[in-house]
Amino acid sequence: MKTEQPMRTHYCGEVKVADVGEAITVAGWVHRRRDHGGVIFVDLRDTTGLIQLVFNPEHQDLFSEAEKLRGEFVLSASGTIRNRPEGTINPELPTGEVELLVLSLVVLNTSATPPFHHNEHAHEDVRLKYRYLDLRRNEMANNLKVRHDIIRSLRNFLDKKDFIDIETPILTKATPEGARDYLVPSRTQKGDFFALPQSPQLFKQLLMMSGFDKYYQIARCFRDEDLRADRQPEFTQLDIEMSFVSEEGVLQTMESMIRNLFQEVLSDPLPDPFIRLSYEDAMARFGTDRPNLGVAMELVDVGDLMRQVEFNVFSGPANDKDSRVACLKLKNAKNITRKQIDDYTNFVGEFGAKGLAYIKVDDISTGADGLQSPILKFLDEKTIHSLIERLALANGDIVFFGADKISIVNASLGALRVKLAEDFDQMNSGWFPLWITDFPMFNWGEKEKRWMAEHHPFTAPKVTTTDELIQNPGEALSCAYDFVLNGHEIGGGSIRIHSQTMQEAVFEIIGIGSTEAEEKFGFLLEALKFGCPPHGGIAFGIDRLAMLMTGSKSIRDVIAFPKTQTANCLLTDAPSQPETDQLKELGLSVRAKK
């Protein structure tokens, strides 16, 4: 009986000097072919790396076959491992000291000329259209391997902590924010629609009510919204819920999990404990609830110094309780140009700021005479001295001011803070994890003219009675928390409402009356009657986490088959028009595009 030869005995990138003299078989793709003075060299690539194949002309048939090889041909090559000749060793390759003298070759498949080379920086649209070729690149393959390592580490940690993995439905009910739901028509109940879940939120709460103590799931979620570099219409999150737990209990467990993850996958230790900031403190100091603590600059309030100045741009907001006057100090900026300042003025304008006042420090020893600014003429000597003292100004500093509604100042200076750090190389390297806590329970929707849940309507308030909540919803804080890493919101969660009366009160405050509440959340309200335990949880964005841990610029680089920023799949050309018969069976018709 003839024994079939294996397609490979070794992986390309794992061949070592210790294998010299061994007869081996490798398989993979032609990465590059070179003809050097009658000897043909082929770099063969597989998932582990490269090995150099050598074809000598004395093996005429093999040499003729090698001459026909082209990029991305698929081969199985057998031969003997030998040391590379002196002067040809490649220290950049793990296999750079050895080569395979080929004695047998099987061409398993040919290839058309690829639309881009492995080392070429092709346009992203081309990469997405030919994603199966893009994923052959080391960078992309490594990204998906790291993603796998991330998920494996998270699973192992939670398994050891007695969490259990439970799947929740993909076909479910539309949410109150239904405009962002992907809808799926029901064939059996014409005119009715399922919605794809934006999160497993209610199902994981129901699992706690069912007596499961600790739950997790690597959940696929869907949201129909405008996309950014770190958003996709379908995304993956690590979903977690725990019973009989406090906010502190959730944060401590999750902090241990994240610290373990970075140690296992990247061998990077994270600080212990993570920094914690209240929402109010984060907004005041950084202008955002997801600050990058790798930037040392902070917003400094100077409104109290500006109430009496004869400069309405400052004094107006300084005397308005809904406004703010704050500033940023950039150090070592003596070479900043007028054009750069104009560019930063335009930049903050994108966030609603009407201008960007500044003071540049040339020689602090001469007081006001050592400062440059068009606004100095509006500020008296006492105010200038107070600014110098409060900001600890030094030569080469420049101070940028924001004076407007609180939201505009926070957004504009918060964004400018990061941009200045990037432009002036003042971004500290490393990992800067933190928790944001004590979020407002509600925010007032100017457009909607009603209170809206800051996180979601199932978040528990810090107050203990419905009367306190109803009397002053604008002052109520929630038991919500976000995990922020280097300026990115990676996770968010809360302690949940476990009282039916409190849940009904929250619905009422955000404009969901009893009829609508019963229609959309009747199953939840009913479940809350039957001994619901205190519970809480969190969800982490796997895509965004993988993006940061691989150093990628977009989550599209850590997803095997992502959508574009217009939610298209360039590989499969989805979404597409359905067949007429499909629509008919569903009882649907499509209006023609105008």
Per-range role (PLM):
Residues 1-594:
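Class II aminoacyl-tRNA synthetase catalytic cores and aaRS-like
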